[in-house]
Every structure is written in structure tokens, then in C-alpha cells.
Amino acid sequence: MNRQTGRVLAGLCALGMAAVIAAPAGAQTSEVQEKPPLYSYISNWAIPRAQWADMAKADDADRAALEKALTSGTIVGYGSDVNLIHRPDGETHDQWWSATSLAGVMNVLDQFYSSGSTTSPVLASATKHWDELYVSRFYNWHSGSVKNGYTHVSLYKLKPDASDDAVEMFSKSLVVPLLEKQLAAGTIAEYEVDEEAIHTDAPGSFLIVYLATNAEGLDKVQGAIEEAIKSNPLGGVAFSSMTDISAHRDELVRTNASYK
């Protein structure tokens, strides 16, 4: 998905604000550790509405190759998304896969180029196309598949004077503990905190992403965020001191995904 574009400002803006609550200092950060890098390749497409059914068929056709890569361990997850909040300059669809190495990501991409699926008629009909490559060190998921889930993505941009470890601090202090609880409850199937691995935009941005298994999960996560903020309303002040709120954007997409 284009994990850098917009919807509903309330969303995980609240989660980002809550992320600085760190109560007490170091109590939660000592429990959350960085994981090995997880790389995600996202291919975004703006497809004319008349070709949306063909795009769904193209996603189905690609599934066999992705499932084979998942089974072999080349990748650890894959999926496709349909954008639910349309913008004049945005994508309508995307396809993505994740691996614990750049080689895993690139090997799958090479397979698609070799098979000719990247030049299919429906992709040729796209009015816009762009790719993104992200890396995460804070993430988790449940093994299995999700059909017609909801992925919520929030983009934030750090201020120039923000500390070098700001994203790590946000992640360890609340984002991971909060979303781990939602994962354990089955409210979400996956989450990650992403930064660009290949910078197609200026450095300093990060994403908070979670996949709700159903629409009710969006409300449950939002409720958990609101409770976290109530526990320390000053958290938003600290978060605002390190992020440029004018650059904040959200995205909501319908997701089919599988994880190893």
C-alpha cells in the first residue's frame, strides 16, 4: 500500500501521542527489544475503476508464487490491499510481501519480472505506479491468513531537532506494548513500525501500521489508544515536541494477507 498518504487525522495520531507516556521510565522499555530487520516491498497502482475486477484476478494469479515463497521461507508474509479512502493523486490497489532479508524481497520481485506478470494488461492500464521498500525492527503477527481485514496506517515526520532514537523510544514505550495486547486478544493479526529502507522521500518519517481482523477491531484499537491517553494526557505534548503534526497522514485499506 502507499503507506504515506491520508485519512482520518484522529486514528493513530492518538497512538503516536500516547507513545511517549513511558510509565514509569524504563519499566516497559526494558521489556521491548528490537527484532532483526523485516523488509516490506509495496507496489502501488492507480487502476481505473472499470479494471478493478481484473486487478482482483491478477492478485489471485500472483498468489501461487507468493504462497510458494512463503512456504519455502523466502518471505514471511504477503498480501494485497484495496484503498478505502480515495484521493485524486493516490493509489487504488497495492500488492506487498515481507522478508527478513533484502535478498528474499528481491528474489520474489525477480520472479514476477521473469514471469511477465509485471506487464499484464491490467497493470498497463494504471494511471500511476510507484514502489516503496520499508524496514521494521518492531513488529509481530499471528501465523495464518486474514481475508477482508482492515489495515490502518499512520505516517509521522520527526522534527529536525528530534532525538536520533525517537522512533525507538516511541516504539518501546507504548506502541509495541499496546499493540501486543491487541494481538494477544485477536483484535489485530499484525503490526509494525516502519521506516524507509530506500529513501524515496526525505528521511525522518516513520509509520505505525496494524491489521485489524474485522471492522470492530478498528474501534477496539481506538478505544485502547484513548484509554492510554487518559492515563497521561501530557503525553501528547511530548510527542508534539518531536513530530511535525502538519505532515501527519493516515490510510485505511481492505486487506487480504497471509503470514508464516
Walk through the language-model features, giving the residues of each:
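Bacterial N-terminal signal peptides
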Residues: A10-V20
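Short S/T/G/P-rich N-terminal loop/turn motif that feeds into the first structured element of a domain
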Residues: G26-S117, P121-N232, V237-K260
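N-terminal secretory signal peptides that target proteins for export/translocation
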Residues: M1-R7
